[in-house]
């Protein structure tokens, strides 16, 4: 039997969930015509842990260690959104020093997240050298985190009304030294990557998203700013101390994978500027609002007895969440990270809805990869920058 020459046999291929370019347990069901992508269906849920339901049976302080497992490469942002929600709901003031410390930690976390995006992204498209270079600078950031918080990852550092501990002696000088050093490292990255003809061949004009299209899909962060939209929640919401610093929103108008790379490189430079300004202008004073410790604290008379003399009794501060609804958001490295909180006059949230930026940005992937080559999937997916911990929650 002869097969007509015009007939095309389509091939269905599973990419992931254990593929190294999937950045986690993401599975793509691809329909291919040779090397051309006809259709793409993402399959999610392999890392679902019920983070929203867990919050309904915990106080905010008890829930804080869980939130660092959403986006485990930018844990400071998941922590700050978790404490911002009850702070706004209960009208709790944050001391100025704590606000500056939070801003410094957030921007260091943004740089660390962008570095760990840059290395694997370059490895996905065939450049192995930057993958090893980024760990050199990232290690220095984690050393700073370890000195201030005691943990390299999953810091559990933010508290309602401030932070867990003040900056140790000499930490500010070490951080300033890192900022000066990192600017030279960033120039090295740009010299190595930005004008490389092979790199430009792989990313220029790949995965183009228009401005109106980005808004319609609900994209945020570098995905939105690379499409010509100057939208940064740090400028719009004036969260923490960002309005006190001199910095510029990084954006591009081309909307392709190269534009998303340039936005993130520019953001790292702006983050260094903000950290330097914060370190030079950090005020004195308390690092936490001590009044929050008085909320519903239980004390027992026997705790003052001899048997309890050497045992530290610091019960977790809890307070009644008023019967209100509240949406809080922060500009995370991957986009707008938000939490919708509903209180019902108890210590536990009645509803805790997470708005992860990676989940929203991933929706446009099937549209971007259609009619592209199979090898371009790694470029496009890498430029989106997803972490499956926050996508699946």
Swiss-Prot record:
NDH is composed of at least 16 different subunits, 5 of which are encoded in the nucleus. Gene3D superfamilies: Cytochrome-c3 Hydrogenase, chain B. It catalyses: a plastoquinone + NADH + (n+1) H(+)(in) = a plastoquinol + NAD(+) + n H(+)(out); a plastoquinone + NADPH + (n+1) H(+)(in) = a plastoquinol + NADP(+) + n H(+)(out). The gene is ndhH. Its EC number is 7.1.1.-. It is a peripheral membrane protein. GO terms for molecular function: NAD binding; oxidoreductase activity, acting on NAD(P)H, quinone or similar compound as acceptor; quinone binding. Pfam families: Complex1_49kDa. PROSITE patterns: COMPLEX1_49K (PS00535). NDH shuttles electrons from NAD(P)H:plastoquinone, via FMN and iron-sulfur (Fe-S) centers, to quinones in the photosynthetic chain and possibly in a chloroplast respiratory chain. The immediate electron acceptor for the enzyme in this species is believed to be plastoquinone. Couples the redox reaction to proton translocation, and thus conserves the redox energy in a proton gradient. This is NAD(P)H-quinone oxidoreductase subunit H, chloroplastic. It comes from Pelargonium hortorum.
